[in-house]
């Protein structure tokens, strides 16, 4: 799988969110007096069988007080044969679909960025990273979002029964294809632990030899990156 160029990421993830775009957008609008909207589209991640492409659209609402700004996102799954689109949204605490107009209870200052990171080897499941944080705080952690084609089911998972402040999604488990690998730790501490988590949230210590794996091809197109202002 082709990896994107190295980019800034709050958790030093191997699958960085477009944090440099978030920071650059804030720098471009230092004196806003009313909310502004900006948009970004991720590269597409094409399944190994070439049938599907997954990509995310990100909306940033910039407020005069940057700590009240919001970043929200949604994942699109496109059938490349039929052109049909399916929307995938995480069920994590800050997740919200910014492209569906409705009253939102999501608090101000939230950051929720979903990006596709890996297909399964057979192309029947996709793994996405849901990065969540709060502007102006040290709160930051990952969730895994797994879409399963056979059941058309979406699962949002993170390590459970484990004490940590930050979790970083690493990819599929190389030893157990139905599980994903996370690395967890506490802010300011060097010690890290690795965990294998299934779609039910069951969490076990990862085998030392278990290495993360990813499948799929990242494809850039003319729509990738910052988009026209909405």
Model-assigned labels for residue ranges:
Residues 1-230:
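Sequence signature of WD/YWTD-type beta-propeller architectures
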């Amino acid at each position: 799988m082709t990896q994107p160029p190295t980019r800034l990421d709050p958790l030093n993830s191997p699958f960085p969110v477009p944090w440099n775009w978030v920071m650059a957008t804030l720098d471009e609008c230092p004196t806003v007096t009313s909310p502004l909207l900006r948009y970004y589209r991720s590269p597409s991640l094409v399944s190994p069988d070439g049938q599907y492409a997954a990509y995310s659209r990100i909306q940033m609402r910039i407020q005069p007080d940057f700590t009240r700004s919001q970043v929200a996102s949604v994942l699109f799954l496109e059938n490349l044969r039929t052109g049909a689109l399916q929307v995938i949204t995480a069920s994590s605490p800050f997740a919200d679909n910014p492209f569906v107009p409705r009253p939102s209870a999501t608090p101000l200052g939230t950051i929720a960025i979903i990006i596709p990171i890996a297909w399964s080897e057979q192309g029947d499941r996709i793994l996405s990273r849901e990065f969540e944080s709060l502007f102006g705080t040290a709160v930051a952690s990952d969730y895994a979002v797994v879409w399963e084609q056979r059941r058309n089911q979406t699962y949002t998972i993170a390590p459970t029964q484990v004490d940590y402040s930050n979790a970083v999604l690493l990819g599929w488990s190389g030893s157990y294809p139905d599980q994903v690998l996370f690395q967890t730790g506490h802010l300011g501490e060097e010690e890290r632990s690795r965990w294998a988590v299934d779609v039910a949230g069951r969490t076990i210590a990862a085998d030392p030899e278990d290495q993360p794996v990813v499948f799929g091809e990242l494809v850039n197109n003319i729509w990738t990156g910052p988009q026209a202002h909405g």
